[in-house]
Amino acid sequence: METNDLGFVASLLFILVPAIFLIVLYIGTNRSES
């Protein structure tokens, strides 16, 4: 159970962190252009 939970959290962070980074980068480029 514990290992599964840790793996789930790790995979969730592995997906969320780059996604948030790309969104922030995308918003930043849009603001600078406009």
Swiss-Prot record:
- Which superkingdom does the taxonomy of this entry point to? Bacteria
The UniProt transmembrane annotation reads: 7-27
For this protein, the record's InterPro entries field holds:
PSII_PsbM, PSII_PsbM_sf
The topology of this chain with respect to the membrane is: Single-pass membrane protein
Matching Pfam families: PsbM (PF05151)
Does Coiled coil count among this protein's keywords? no
Annotated keywords: Membrane, Photosynthesis, Photosystem II, Reaction center, Thylakoid, Transmembrane, Transmembrane helix
Swiss-Prot/TrEMBL GO biological process terms? photosynthesis, light reaction
* Function (record text): One of the components of the core complex of photosystem II (PSII). PSII is a light-driven water:plastoquinone oxidoreductase that uses light energy to abstract electrons from H(2)O, generating O(2) and a proton gradient subsequently used for ATP formation. It consists of a core antenna complex that captures photons, and an electron transfer chain that converts photonic excitation into a charge separation. This subunit is found at the monomer-monomer interface.
User: Matching NCBIfam families, A to Z?
Assistant: PS_II_psbM (TIGR03038)
The similarity annotation says: Belongs to the PsbM family.
| Protein name from the UniProt record | Photosystem II reaction center protein M
Q: Lineage from the top down?
A: Bacteria, Bacillati, Cyanobacteriota, Cyanophyceae, Synechococcales
